UniProtKB/Swiss-Prot annotation:
E.C. designation(s): 1.15.1.1
Keyword Membrane: no
Species whose genome carries this gene: Oryza sativa subsp. japonica
Name this protein carries in UniProt: Superoxide dismutase [Cu-Zn] 1
Residue ranges of the TM segments: none
Compartments, as annotated in UniProt: Cytoplasm
Cofactor(s), names only, from the UniProt record: Cu cation; Zn(2+)
Amino acid sequence: MVKAVVVLGSSEIVKGTIHFVQEGDGPTTVTGSVSGLKPGLHGFHIHALGDTTNGCMSTGPHYNPAGKEHGAPEDETRHAGDLGNVTAGEDGVANIHVVDSQIPLTGPNSIIGRAVVVHADPDDLGKGGHELSKTTGNAGGRVACGIIGLQG
């Protein structure tokens, strides 16, 4: 079993901790919570770079080793880092539980050292018809991010 963790932060009030667990070659389970969000849906993605030198903007595009268009987590055509949306309640807290086979913690496409980004707006899952739908899901600004690291 391989475990990883990311502590999310920003210059805003948004913060959280996300845990990743992968058993063997199986899917990766993602759990945790994010607080300080406005109520509603927020895009939740793995971005390509583990670089926060310019805040969340320097984390690059969505992690996309296969060179596909943006989509929903259940779509065949999607970025590996497309994990859809998280839903914040009236208290501003989003509880996260995702199981995904495209975000391994080991091997050539490992997400270790990459970034988790929570966005200001809903991800339209590539189906919104906006010019950004097929690249970012038109999910708006980056309100929190952190770098995924191995955990003992």
